[in-house]
Amino acid sequence: MNTTTLTLNESWLSRRNLFDWVFAALVVAGGLFAFARYAGSMDYYEKPILIAAVIATIAIGWFWRPLRVLAIVVAAASLLAIASYQGDLARADTVFWLKYFLSSQSAILWMSVLFFMSTLFYWLGFFGGKQADTFDAIGSRLAWAAVTMALIGTMVRWYESHQLGPDIGHIPVSNLYEVFVLFCWLTAVFYLYFEERYGTRALGAFVMLVVSAAVGFLLWYTIVREAHEIQPLVPALQSWWMKLHVPANFIGYGTFALAAMVAFAYLIKEQAEEKRWYKLTPIWLLGVALCFVPVAFRQRVQEAGGSYWVIYAGISALIAAGILLGRKRIAARLPANEVLDDVMYKSITVGFAFFTIATVLGALWAADAWGGYWSWDPKETWALIVWLNYAAWLHMRLMSGLRGRPAAWWALVGLLVTTFALDRKSVV
């Protein structure tokens, strides 16, 4: 007689394999190396952030294994870039790897190109016939490559800022250029997690549209304002609360944007057989509006860039119209409505949790910088409006079973509310 021994209530740690522990050892070694080499350049708050980052990286890498490879590649490439500089930023113009790949600006330009290419291949997946799965796979790999270059650019930019002077170095989450890079890779990473979790790549075409829109703004902002230049922080931005507040905030913004694009896909699937164009017009208008989410930040700068935005508007309108024209073929490849609804719900749940944390951290930052937790100025008032909007969405979902088309429309309008709020308040 065969007997089988069952292990009940196996602990989380006991389920770790050899690669898990090797990864943890590498992360700890990297953290110790960073502390030993750069502790003198760290502010008092950056040391506990480093410790927390080591713990979080190990935990997240164990939870979602693709992030382990990402972390190792980013760390190796960042260290190669730092070693190539040899303490001289002028080497970015003479060393091949720095000039074309690993300086912060080069890496972020590669991020931009790769996100555009990823978006293209994801959309080719809807119309590629027998090659559709191949196109989707290429789109996914390009998205991973773009995230990798974004993180390399961020890490190297952090190093570059410290090389400019002891009072200039800072974690690169402090201006519009840096937070748009943050938004792009955070949104993409959350999408890639859902892609693996639900076993479908069809949503990549929609999510990468809003990421590409953000990249389009980033490139315009770089050209018009030379925003890639590293500048010293004003005193109010030197608070360590801000270094926690901004990433938490943009996890919220990124997942809210992801939920809105999934909601857009849901409505396209629902309207696949609709022939009356007047009923499709609201979806077309919202599709164009979604592409303009990053443009909420444009009026912060003085340069109009009129011709660029005319072209941008035209491309956005054509993309939205093309999606509606191909809605039957697109709907056929989209996952079931239940999957779309679940991704929407989980994205908003994650976003709401981090936006709540960011709001609390923002209040602590305000108290530290300006002496009061809450003053009802525009940025605080609109942050509260955004929070209440998504709190109401989740309440209706949990208490009244909000699902389907009403939930999708609300998620879409919710992102527009968030965009309007961002237009009325500072980035951070």
Regions found by a protein language model. Name each.
Residues 427:
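Conserved small/polar residues in nucleotide/adenosyl-binding loops
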Residues 139-145, 206-211, 278-284, 332-356, ...:
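Interfacial and helix-entry/exit segments of alpha-helical transmembrane bundles
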Residues 48-58, 108-121, 179-192, 247-265, ...:
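Hydrophobic cores of alpha-helical transmembrane segments in multi-pass inner/ER membrane proteins
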Residues 12-13, 39-47, 86-87, 147-207, ...:
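Membrane-interface helix-loop-helix modules in multi-pass inner-membrane proteins
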Residues 9-95, 109, 113-117, 274-327:
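Transmembrane alpha-helices
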Residues 168-177, 186-252, 269, 275-276:
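Membrane-interface helix-loop-helix junctions at boundaries between adjacent transmembrane segments
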